[in-house]
């Protein structure tokens, strides 16, 4: 409980300010007591009100972006979940792009919106999700939420042209290329397939500046057109 004293003013009126910030949310019972100068106690008067001061927060476990990785310009879906009913999370962003929420006139625990992925430099691997601008029904402004690496930007791979190969060079065909948004520890898989769908594979890791290279042994493949591909998933799980 909290208590406060005051004195009676002219015409029997009185007033006071109570600090209830340390009390629990819910029903608050307020009473007033006093004894006059003749020692006679007044009958206690009382009332109640509802206290709601806990700020709404984002439920991290139920907040998501779909898909979890995308290229610049793609549209992704943001589902934001809160621990209580809130107003529209106005001003929320993915990176610097504003999220367009589905309009509702009421407060709710879940808000769904769409946003277009902004263009970013090749060195940028992910975007941050920021949720803010929401209030509960009592007018308490929510705690701003920030999630780094919320959306992975799709990495890229290139493969340099490979010249024709004869029997002498088939055991070690050099393949190389470039990449963006991979770490030097990330693994790539290179595959060579002949016209009979027989294949050979080789793994390598990305080197400095996104470059990569490997040597393929295609001596066991059939003469003719050989199709070579490279694939990989970066440390954020984006292929």
Residue ranges and their predicted role:
Residues 1-2, 76-103, 132, 184-195:
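Short, surface-exposed alpha-helix to beta-strand junction/turn motifs within ectodomains of secreted
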Residues 2-12, 96-106, 198-210:
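Solvent-exposed serine/threonine-rich low-complexity stretches and specific carbohydrate-binding patches
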Residues 10-17, 106-116, 208-215:
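Aromatic sugar-binding surface patches on proteins
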Residues 19, 45-59, 136, 145-160, ...:
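Flexible, low-complexity linkers/stalks enriched in Thr/Pro that connect modular domains
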Residues 19-27, 117-126, 217-225:
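Surface-exposed, short loops/turns at beta-strand junctions within beta-sandwich domains
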Residues 35-40, 134-141, 233-238:
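Short, solvent-exposed loop/turn segments at the edges of extracellular beta-sandwich modules
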Residues 65-74, 163-171:
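Short, solvent-exposed loop/linker segments at the N-terminal edge
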């Amino acid at each position: 409980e909290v208590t406060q004293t005051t004195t009676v003013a002219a015409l029997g009126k009185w007033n006071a300010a109570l600090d209830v910030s340390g009390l629990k949310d819910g029903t608050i019972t307020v009473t007033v007591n006093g004894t006059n100068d003749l020692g006679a106690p007044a009958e206690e008067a009382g009332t109640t009100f509802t206290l709601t001061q806990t700020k709404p927060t984002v439920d991290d476990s139920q907040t998501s972006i779909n898909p979890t990785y995308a290229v610049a310009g793609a549209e992704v879906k943001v589902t934001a979940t809160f621990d209580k009913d809130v107003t529209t999370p106005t001003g929320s962003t993915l990176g610097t792009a504003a999220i367009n929420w589905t309009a509702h006139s009421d407060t709710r625990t879940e808000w769904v919106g769409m946003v277009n992925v902004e263009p970013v430099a090749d060195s940028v691997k992910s975007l941050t999700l920021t949720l803010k601008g929401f209030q509960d029904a009592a007018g308490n402004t929510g705690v701003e939420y920030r999630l780094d690496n919320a959306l992975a930007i799709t990495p890229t791979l290139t493969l340099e042209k490979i010249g024709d190969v004869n029997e002498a060079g088939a055991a070690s065909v050099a393949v190389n290329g470039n990449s963006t948004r991979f770490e030097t520890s990330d693994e790539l898989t290179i595959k060579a397939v002949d016209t009979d769908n027989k294949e050979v594979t080789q793994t390598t890791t990305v080197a400095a500046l996104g470059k990569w290279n490997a040597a393929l042994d295609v001596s066991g493949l059939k003469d003719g057109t050989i199709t070579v591909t490279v694939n990989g998933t970066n440390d954020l799980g984006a292929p």
